[in-house]
């Protein structure tokens, strides 16, 4: 139903907004999909969220919109508040983990908060939607001396792969990138003039001058030992000259940790955690750390303020 013929418009007139605020039962799923795309555009342009975060929002909200569409197709007129309660029950029936359900609820709340803030809705139907309580596991992280032991296992070797590994460990520990972000880097993402990694247009993570020198040498020399095709833009290459995969680097990190005699499970995520803990210990504000880590929600960053034992 499109009573005033404006469903396909990207820009909503005040007349259309007023109509839809008072007739939410008749807002079609097509209109909501336009709102959905406007929300993702807002997250991209105004919030500067990473592609990984945007993909999570898209997946979560696609599921939510599909559920509402299916319920509306049954012809039973009900409020969005009731629909969202039913959606939450559906998530529980699917036996998602508490953490996954909490993330999907948080995505839904963010979307409807945007709907109200942008004038598309008068009231937020997700405002009182209960959020599952996620129990926080102890965060595993490396002390500086443990990190040096890990790094030493790569540095002591002279192969092109080991030189690459040492640079990857240094960069991960110094920037807290996600492993997916690390292996997705191209040479153009390293800005040696400003000493930073450019993840996307809105997110840049700085590093020290010392690491800039290491990266510069790697780009000019060590990387070329693994380069077979000059058109290849990947920063970190495998022995075949192709982009190193996240699974590959996960196994590499595990191997170095074992040889270093580090007890417990050490993964690239452990280095990301170590970066975050170190930043907070050095006085970095929580919202600044959120930007550095590329977290969509401050609650994801807040876990690093909780006491956490070291590995082992």
Label each residue range with its predicted role.
Residues 7-11, 21:
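Charged/polar low-complexity intrinsically disordered segments
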Residues 16-312:
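Conserved catalytic core of the tyrosine transesterase superfamily
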């Amino acid at each position: 139903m499109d009573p005033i013929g404006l469903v396909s418009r990207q820009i909503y007139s005040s007349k259309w907004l007023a109509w839809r605020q008072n007739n939410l039962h008749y807002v079609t799923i097509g209109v909501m999909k336009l709102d959905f795309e406007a929300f993702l555009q807002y997250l991209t342009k105004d919030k500067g969220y990473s592609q990984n975060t945007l993909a999570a929002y898209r997946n979560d909200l696609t599921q939510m919109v599909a559920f509402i569409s299916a319920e509306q197709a049954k012809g039973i007129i009900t409020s969005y508040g009731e629909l969202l309660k039913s959606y939450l029950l559906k998530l529980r029936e699917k036996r998602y983990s508490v953490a996954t359900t909490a993330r999907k609820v948080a995505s839904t709340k963010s979307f409807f908060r945007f709907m109200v803030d942008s004038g598309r809705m008068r009231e937020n139907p997700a405002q009182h939607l209960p959020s599952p309580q996620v129990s926080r596991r102890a965060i595993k992280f490396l002390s500086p001396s443990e990190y040096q032991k890990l790094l030493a296992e790569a540095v002591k070797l002279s192969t092109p792969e080991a030189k690459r590994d040492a640079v990857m460990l240094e960069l991960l520990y110094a920037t807290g990138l996600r492993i997916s972000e690390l292996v997705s880097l191209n040479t153009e993402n390293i800005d040696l003039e400003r000493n930073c990694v450019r993840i996307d247009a809105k997110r840049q993570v700085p590093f020290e001058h010392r690491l800039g020198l290491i990266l510069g040498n790697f780009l000019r020399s060590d990387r070329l030992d693994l380069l077979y095709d000059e058109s290849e833009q990947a920063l970190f290459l495998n022995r075949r000259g192709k982009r190193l995969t996240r699974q590959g680097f996960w196994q590499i990190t595990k191997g170095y940790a074992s040889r270093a005699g580090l007890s417990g499970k050490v993964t690239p995520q452990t280095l990301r955690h170590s970066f975050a803990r170190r930043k907070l210990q050095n006085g970095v504000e929580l919202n600044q750390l959120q930007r550095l880590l590329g977290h969509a929600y401050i609650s994801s960053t807040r876990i690093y303020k909780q006491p956490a034992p070291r590995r082992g």
